[in-house]
Design a protein with these regions (language model features):
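Nucleotide/pyrophosphate-binding catalytic subdomain
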Residues: 7-210
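Single conserved hydrophobic/aromatic residue that forms the stacking wall/gate
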Residues: 1-6
Length: 210
């Protein structure tokens, strides 16, 4: 069936190859240096180089210079590990929005957590629905929001998937699809077994057991 593309939530870049390091891990390592009072400019610039290569490869006109200045400043001010981990999603969302010509919505302005660290579903749904009603198309980073203390907070594992479902609910989407870099479910871990066969039909119960 045909699909209309309205709201897009975006994950950050992963590994470019099996020997590569994920951006999240690079950000964690960089923040650890900042938290310990060590020099972190060089590893931070390595992260920027990865994003610059994406910008150049796609022929985008956007620049992330100011964003990285802000990240550096916030790292020095100990913005927190959640803030560090979320920056990959944030930066990639900016690039995707520029590439698609969509509006960029920072998740920290529309996804809220309460004082206990749980999703404030009612506030999030209300604010997000209003924001989405004001724009035709938007890119929203997954994985994070803002805590009651005003600091960036991340969801637990699978947070990008959760963000997608939150956005789908807020805009009353008739269909929400979660795409990954693997085509379906496989009978074995492809990192261990070469060319494992796909599972064509599987129940939710069976999937949960996997």
């Amino acid at each position: 069936p045909s699909r209309g593309l309205g709201d897009v939530y975006k994950r950050q870049p992963g590994k470019r190859n099996s020997r590569d390091t994920k951006v999240t891990d690079m950000l964690y390592a960089c923040y650890a240096k900042a938290e310990a009072g060590e020099e972190f400019r060089v590893p931070l610039m390595k992260i920027k180089e990865r994003y610059d290569s994406i910008i150049n490869g796609l022929g985008l006109k956007v620049t992330l210079d100011e964003e990285f200045k802000t990240i550096s400043k916030n790292f020095k001010e100990k913005a927190g590990a959640d803030y560090a981990a979320s920056r990959g999603e944030y930066l990639n969302g900016i690039l995707m929005a520029d590439y698609l010509g969509y509006e960029f919505i920072d998740s920290a302005t529309v996804i809220f957590f309460d004082e206990e660290g749980n999703l404030d579903a009612d506030k999030t749904d209300k604010v997000l629905a209003k924001k989405l009603s004001e724009c035709e198309k938007a890119v929203i980073p997954g994985f994070y929001g803002i805590g009651a203390d005003g600091r960036v907070k991340t969801f637990s594992r699978g947070g990008s998937d959760i963000t997608g479902s939150i956005v789908a609910k807020a805009c009353h989407a008739s269909l929400y699809e979660n795409w990954t870099d693997v085509s379906g479910c496989l009978v074995a871990d492809p990192r261990i077994i070469d060319n494992p066969q796909p599972i064509h039909v599987i129940t939710y119960r069976e999937l949960r057991e996997l």
